[in-house]
């Protein structure tokens, strides 16, 4: 496996990550045995970056349980995402994040991403709700290690908002 070093954290991240959105199973009910096998095999092959999200039904629970059963939480960099569009007040950041920690059976998220930002206006909305101060508090408490975003808008809008 090839690795890259995150210059901000020093983390050595596998060039290939495991996107955990679509584990086999019924919608909202990923098959635990299959998820265990996929995660185990990925880690055996050197993958150490796992990506999930609040909005992937049943997924965070499945990933958290698999990591616990397999004893792999400390061997992976875990990424999940805030469903920012569902946040209407600052308290929602805590509500979603605390639920994510419970679902993932962990005390920290290595890479916490703002999910599916499609315009600079969406980012401005969560900034107005206090996301920057909230993130700073979570980082200071060690509950979030690094932050980021997944952007799904146009390149032109992104570059205009940068």
Model regions: which residues?
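N-terminal binding-site loop/beta-alpha segment at the start of enzyme catalytic domains
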Residues: 1-76, 140
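Structural preference for beta-strand elements that scaffold enzyme active sites
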Residues: 13-17, 48-49, 75-81, 108-113, ...
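Hydrophobic pocket-lining residues within nucleotide cofactor-binding pockets
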Residues: 23, 82, 117
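Glycine/proline-rich, positively charged
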Residues: 26-27, 40, 44, 87-162
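Active-site-proximal beta-strand/loop segments in catalytic clefts of secreted hydrolases
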Residues: 53, 81-83, 150-152
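Generic structural signal for short, solvent-exposed loop/turn connectors between secondary structure elements
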Residues: 55-62, 82-94
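Hydrophobic positions in alpha-helices of CheY-like receiver
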Residues: 67, 82, 135-138
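Short alpha-helix boundary/capping motifs
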Residues: 70-71, 79, 128-129
């Amino acid at each position: 496996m090839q690795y890259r070093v995150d210059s901000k954290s020093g983390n050595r991240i596998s060039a290939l990550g495991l996107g955990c959105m679509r584990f086999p199973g019924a919608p909202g009910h990923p098959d635990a045995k299959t998820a265990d096998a996929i995660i185990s095999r990925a880690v055996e092959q050197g993958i150490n970056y796992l990506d999930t999200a609040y909005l992937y039904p049943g997924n965070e629970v499945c990933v958290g349980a698999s990591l616990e059963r397999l004893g792999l939480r400390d061997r992976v960099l875990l990424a999940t995402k805030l469903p920012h569009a569902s946040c209407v007040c600052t308290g929602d950041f805590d509500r979603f994040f605390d639920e994510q920690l419970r679902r993932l059976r962990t005390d920290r998220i290595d890479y916490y991403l703002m999910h599916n930002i499609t315009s600079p206006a969406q980012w401005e909305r969560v900034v107005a709700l206090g996301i920057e101060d909230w993130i700073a508090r979570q980082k200071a408490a060690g509950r979030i290690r690094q932050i980021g975003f997944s952007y799904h808008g146009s390149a032109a809008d992104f570059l205009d908002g940068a």
